[in-house]
């Protein structure tokens, strides 16, 4: 054997100090096996997360509607985010630009309450262009439907908040659908009111009463089916800050004195119903959806008070509401040309709450006057509201016996 071979053989033999005992070798081998198992387990968990997808399990009831879903197992798919174009609509929005006009509250932080209201305003989106999604619909159909819902609310002495919740549910639901047939509008409208009444009213009308006011057009089963469709489409987000909620807040903040009692109304009921009537008329026009509810309410308040009151009550500057104030001018002219609305007395409704009960007047005729004025303001011909085929609920004396 050569000297070189002897050196290589000696080098490959373990030195006495480097020799491992059998116990140490077993421990090292167990650690290696555990590490390998942990890595394999983590890979299996990641793979398992990617092995499921959502699939519709029921056929959609409406064209373009949202149906219930199930989670099913699928082959492994790698999830990547290579295309960021779909995130362009999600931009940071500064909600602190409007300081809180709320006074100190005994039951919470006024800044947090105000910020939560602004967040809701941004989350609950509405758009006047939703009729683009529905080729069979015309703007006056929405006006006729909402006018009918106003009348139903008065017949059953429902609160203004109930109507405005129903209006919000209807408008947001229509944004989630496509090509809704005009024959479905009454069902969607009365179901929206049914949902709103269960949220807002202490003694809400029964299901059969909502079916009754449609004069046989909608059955109880139809309303229940549509209720689930609407709730699913809205993702159960049913707590918007409505127009009438903003009006209550603004008038209350303006009326507060040195010792505020925020929980009890401090403002004039007469002032409230005058502005509420203007807002009732405005919301019938589909163009009102171009503005946030807060802006719309502040503009109405400005027409009946002053910009100083608006700044104090809402924290909004003139630049924020000027466009809406100008848009509202024809509505104000029509409202002020009619007899002033008066407080009504309702059975079983306390005097201090009567201004909160929704009332109805000949809003469609008033809206037609607004359209006539806008014809000259905008220099273009606007189609008037059609009075034909208006859905009319029964009179109070014609409600089903034993119902309320």
Swiss-Prot record:
GO terms for cellular component: cyclin E1-CDK2 complex; cyclin E2-CDK2 complex; cytoplasm; cytosol; microtubule organizing center; nucleoplasm; nucleus. According to PubMed:9858585, highest levels of expression in adult testis, thymus and brain. Lower levels in placenta, spleen and colon. Consistently elevated levels in tumor-derived cells compared to non-transformed proliferating cells. According to PubMed:9840927: low levels in thymus, prostate, brain, skeletal muscle, and kidney. Elevated levels in lung. According to PubMed:9840943 highly expressed in testis, placenta, thymus and brain. In a lesser extent in small intestine and colon. It is found in: Nucleus. InterPro entries: Cyclin, Cyclin-like_dom, Cyclin-like_sf, Cyclin_C-dom, Cyclin_N, Cyclins_cyclin-box. Phosphorylation by CDK2 triggers its release from CDK2 and degradation via the ubiquitin proteasome pathway. Lactylated at Lys-348. Delactylated by SIRT3. The modification Phosphothreonine is found at residue 392. Residues 1-44 are annotated as: Disordered. Induction: Activated by papilloma viral oncoproteins E6 and E7 which bind to and inactivate p53 and Rb, respectively. The keyword Transmembrane does not apply. The modification N6-lactoyllysine is found at residue 348. Residues 35-44 have a biased composition (Basic and acidic residues). Keywords: Cell cycle, Cell division, Cyclin, Nucleus, Phosphoprotein. GO terms for molecular function: cyclin-dependent protein serine/threonine kinase regulator activity; protein kinase binding. The modification Phosphoserine is found at residues 21, 383. GO terms for biological process: cell division; DNA replication initiation; G1/S transition of mitotic cell cycle; homologous chromosome pairing at meiosis; positive regulation of G1/S transition of mitotic cell cycle; regulation of cyclin-dependent protein serine/threonine kinase activity; regulation of protein localization; telomere maintenance. Interacts with the CDK2 (in vivo) and CDK3 (in vitro) protein kinases to form a serine/threonine kinase holoenzyme complex. The cyclin subunit imparts substrate specificity to the complex. This is G1/S-specific cyclin-E2. It comes from Homo sapiens.
């Amino acid at each position: 054997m050569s000297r070189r071979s002897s050196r290589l053989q000696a080098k490959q033999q373990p030195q006495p100090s480097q020799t491992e005992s059998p116990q140490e070798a077993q421990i090292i081998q167990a650690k290696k096996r555990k590490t390998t198992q942990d890595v394999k387990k983590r890979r299996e968990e990641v793979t398992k997360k990617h092995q499921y997808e959502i699939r519709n399990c029921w056929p959609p009831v409406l064209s373009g509607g949202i149906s219930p879903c199930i989670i099913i197992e699928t082959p492994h798919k790698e999830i990547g985010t290579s295309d960021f174009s779909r995130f362009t609509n999600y931009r940071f929005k500064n909600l602190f630009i409007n300081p809180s006009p709320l006074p100190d509250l005994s039951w919470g932080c006024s800044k947090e309450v105000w910020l939560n209201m602004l967040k809701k305003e941004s989350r609950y989106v509405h758009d006047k262009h939703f009729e683009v999604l529905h080729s069979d619909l015309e703007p006056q159909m929405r006006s006729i439907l909402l006018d009918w819902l106003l009348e139903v609310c008065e017949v059953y002495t429902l609160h203004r908040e109930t109507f405005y919740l129903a209006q919000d549910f209807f408008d947001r639901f229509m944004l989630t659908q496509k090509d809704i047939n005009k024959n479905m509008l009454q069902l969607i409208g009365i179901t929206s009111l049914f949902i709103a009444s269960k949220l807002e009213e202490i003694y809400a009308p029964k299901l059969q009463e909502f079916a009754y006011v449609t004069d046989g057009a909608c059955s109880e089963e139809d309303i229940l089916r549509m209720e689930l469709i609407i709730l699913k489409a809205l993702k159960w987000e049913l707590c918007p800050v409505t127009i009438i909620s903003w009006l209550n807040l603004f008038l209350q903040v303006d009326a507060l004195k040195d010792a505020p009692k925020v929980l009890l109304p401090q403002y004039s009921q007469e002032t409230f119903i005058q502005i509420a009537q203007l807002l009732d008329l405005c919301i019938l026009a589909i163009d009102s959806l171009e503005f946030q509810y807060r802006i719309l309410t502040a503009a109405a308040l400005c027409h009946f008070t002053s910009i100083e009151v608006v700044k104090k009550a809402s924290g909004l500057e003139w630049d924020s509401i000027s466009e809406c104030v100008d848009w509202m001018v024809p509505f104000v002219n029509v409202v002020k040309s009619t007899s002033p609305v008066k407080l009504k007395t309702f059975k079983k409704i306390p005097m201090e709450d009567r201004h909160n009960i929704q009332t109805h007047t000949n809003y469609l005729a008033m809206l037609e006057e607004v359209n006539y004025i806008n014809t000259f303001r905008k220099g273009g011909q606007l189609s008037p509201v059609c009075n034909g085929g208006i859905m009319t609920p029964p009179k109070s004396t014609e409600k089903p016996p034993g119902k309320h």
